Amino acid sequence: MTKWKRANPNGTRDYLFEECTLIEEVEQKLRRTFLERGYEEIRTPTIEFYDVFAFQSRPIDEEKMYKFFDEKGRIIVLRPDMTIPLARVVGTQRCDTPLKVTYSGNVFRANESLAGKYNEIVQSGIEVIGIDNVRAEIECVISVIQSLQKLKVQSFTIEIGQVQLYKCIVKKLSIHEEEEKVLRTYIESKNYAALSNFIRDKKLDRCDETVKLLEKLPRLFGNLEVIEEAEKLASSNEMKMAITRVKEIYEAIEKLGYGSYISIDLGMIQHLDYYTGVIFKGYIYEIGEEIVSGGRYDELIGNFGEMLPAVGLAVQVNQIVKALQEQQEPYERKRIDIMIHYELNRLAEAERLRNLLQKDGKKVALSLFSNLNDTFQFARKNQIVTVVEAKSESLVEYVWKEKWVVQKEGETSCVTFKLR
């Protein structure tokens, strides 16, 4: 029964020291940026009822959920998604809209072994609820771009797609559900040969404008020229409106000076079925990993209450941390500046000294050792150059200068008061 006691479950890992600090800093900077832009914070439980994710369209594969039973035999899951629980909150709590919310938390999905993906990840994100015009999408994209800039993430791009255009094509060509799943993989992977064979095998008329658009879909990525090409082949008002929406979002963000951070990919199709319109994916060039995902989901909240339009974007914190580690100098956690060694009957005074010294922005810690030499050894091992000894009625300050020496009177000292 102890076979696995020294191992982590598949798809999970431990985060230590510097990496933990960096994850926390990324989360806090994202949170601060979103709060400054008027978003309000929401927290949902790490565990949810299975039914929350089991509505008709089944947006999350059942096999990807971690499931267990509560004390009453009901099926519980570790949340595999952040947006659906937020939709539950908004739908059941009857929140006033429009509403801008932000969140951060862990998400759990059981990926295939050896797929190179973690089963537990950290997501921070935003949702704009109750607005059906392009201002909602624009607000989300601007917020994420600014947050990534503040994190000093280099060479990233956010792709804008339109799942509604794809759904219009599928509907007009009467492609059945099972066939659509296969078609989706061909378009997402930009498998031109397989897509061409699919059109041939289905005996679709290649002279038909909609079929032409379908065949071109994986190639429609780039800038506004892509929109012009798609508009020429759009055979219904619904298709034209879907394309126009992407154009409006792109132009608005470009006018703000963020054009270098965005591109268009009309062949992008999100794997989550609850998206109904414009969708987004963000990447860092050097890594190729997805760092941002999201889109419009106007029908999701209706599963829990009133039907409300909504847009959301999630930032993959783990991937951001990975990018920062690769593009910057090795991250160094802030080391202890001063260590206080004290006699046990001087604990109160030592803690008072620690509080005073840290007000100057220093990192100060109390020694855990009863012997001064042990404190010195620990300080050297951890590159701490100042040790203050609090004993009886006095303070002695030691500094490392090839050896531990007493700080002489008249030299700059970290000690700002005498023990009473």
Curated annotation (Swiss-Prot):
Pfam families membership: tRNA-synt_His (PF13393)
Keywords assigned by UniProt, alphabetized: Amino-acid biosynthesis, Cytoplasm, Histidine biosynthesis
Principal localisation: cytoplasm
GO terms of biological process kind: histidyl-tRNA aminoacylation; L-histidine biosynthetic process
Keyword presence, Cytoplasm: yes
Pathway linked to the protein: Amino-acid biosynthesis; L-histidine biosynthesis; L-histidine from 5-phospho-alpha-D-ribose 1-diphosphate: step 1/9
Location(s) in or outside the cell: Cytoplasm
Note: This function is generally fulfilled by the C-terminal part of HisG, which is missing in some bacteria such as this one.
Similarity comment: family membership: Belongs to the class-II aminoacyl-tRNA synthetase family. HisZ subfamily.
Function: Required for the first step of histidine biosynthesis. May allow the feedback regulation of ATP phosphoribosyltransferase activity by histidine.
Record's protein name: ATP phosphoribosyltransferase regulatory subunit
Name of the encoding gene: hisZ
